[in-house]
């Protein structure tokens, strides 16, 4: 192999950063937070069939400019990673930006998550050209980051600590001018550099203010009509002389620490414009002080376009509003290679929130690249003894085994929903190690609470259930043990897939022991309840069939329904963990009338409470020309007198979203032929729903279903097959094409 081939091999494979040159900018008090680094690259010729590439691995965010032009449309690059262990490399084809002779390559950096890990804003960059020939690719190294580069501070700086509820914002000081100096090198021998799996964030929408009101304190309040995750871009009047503050609110009454603030410091002769660069906010409102006149727009950032993906509509405007709210919320929460709890206050990749809504998210969009990136962070967070944090990248947070078990559920669900087994093969040993850790924490088959550590706090099961639902005590151990049993079932399947038959037998036997222990420890025959008898407790036991016989199952179900109708008044009675479990039970047991009744409740606790307008009136007309107007909340209690206020764009309750597709539209995957290579279409009748129309993207194309006047029309994409109305007299299996059958 010649040196060019060797270089190509090195560029194509993950690099260990030992001996590599990360460069940044030193200032008097340490490292600049948002520096610029640059180098001039000479090209003897262009347009000879060669392509020119820049590969960038930054400890924090970066933007790439070549000859003054920004390269690409991706923002907040790279994705998140476990920065004490891994930096992500992004490759840019800069051929359209270069010219013969001198070319300036400039990287603008932002420390970002490096603030948490004690990493400076530093970057490793490689510039090379590549020519494809019949004999293979020829690669020529043109430049690599080192101390010959130049660096300068920039006008941007951070105002917060990058800790939960303390993220702050950005300060742009127009008085700061470039002061170029030799770049400082930073050794990161403990960091692995590997290619980014995630495709990158894009600006998916641009919004103008729907209103701009002058408040009594002379500040301006901008209302963009809906919550967005992203940036503010604003042009101030040239007469602006004061320091301008921009405070971001996800609802009108939000106050610190539930708000974040950017700062603009003008200078004579500056362009009087501000736009976020290495920070993002979640906001509907912006309160601006210090500016008399301005023009503003909100730039919505995400991994998915909220107008793309799966679609659903039915004859009930209330159900449509909830579906649209859940879908739009998830588009606000999915970015940078993970799905967060909330995009502004914590920004954590919680496994519990992920488990709660993965089936919904993967039903709505193709987010395989997000899960590949996110699972890499879970791998990096895993300790040799199998212990995991509750979020990845790792951060000390609250949660429990349901949060950690994302490492098992995400690969299995990605396989079922996309037919992609790569995560199973890549992380099988990690999943097995975590389950061994859980077994060591168990007594008589029941996992026991552990002490708080520097990695995680608390030992939770359900979280933020409505007032009056007892989610403590036995319920924590019961629901957690049910989840472990579910993970063991998934692991048994994955072990057989990967040829680990002996492991599969062990997982199956262990699951039987856990299920028997659940019934033995938590069933109360006198009340026909498990643990505390919550909706989560009862539904999980029924889903896993932990009871001894069908009579007991019928008694447990009857008690569950009595409590839902009586104690809970046909209202939702579950939290983060309970919502997806209850949803799955309703789908399996064809309880669409029950779910619809609960979803239609206009008062606390319920989803429609989240669709109230600024005057407190319900507004469930769904999306308009502006898109969905509402997002789901962190707590059912948001806005209630005397209750702690929380995030108004959150991932606690989005697990219900799959119900619209699997129950009302009836589109269900077949784990035996995953990725919707074969699927079922079995719409469930629901009182008050006269028609349903839905589409679902799959690796084979879109599935389309329409149900109207007792007639079911189904489009099956090429390469797929579907079983229509399984278990009924009209059951039939069909191939690609459009099919119509009568429901009755």
List each model region and its residues.
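Bacterial Sec-dependent N-terminal signal peptides
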Residues: 1-20
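Extracellular/oxidizing-compartment recognition motifs
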Residues: 20-339, 343, 369-372, 389-393, ...
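Alpha-helical support elements that line or immediately flank enzyme active sites
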Residues: 52-53, 230-248, 275-276, 286, ...
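Active-site acid/base region of carbohydrate-active enzymes
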Residues: 61, 126, 144, 296-325, ...
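Helix-terminus loop motifs that line ligand-binding clefts
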Residues: 73-78, 82, 252-259, 368-466, ...
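Repeat-solenoid scaffold signature
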Residues: 109-128, 567-610
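Non-catalytic C-terminal accessory modules of carbohydrate-active enzymes
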Residues: 124, 128, 150-172, 187, ...
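Carbohydrate-binding/catalytic loop surfaces
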Residues: 343-354, 390-406, 448-477, 524-546, ...
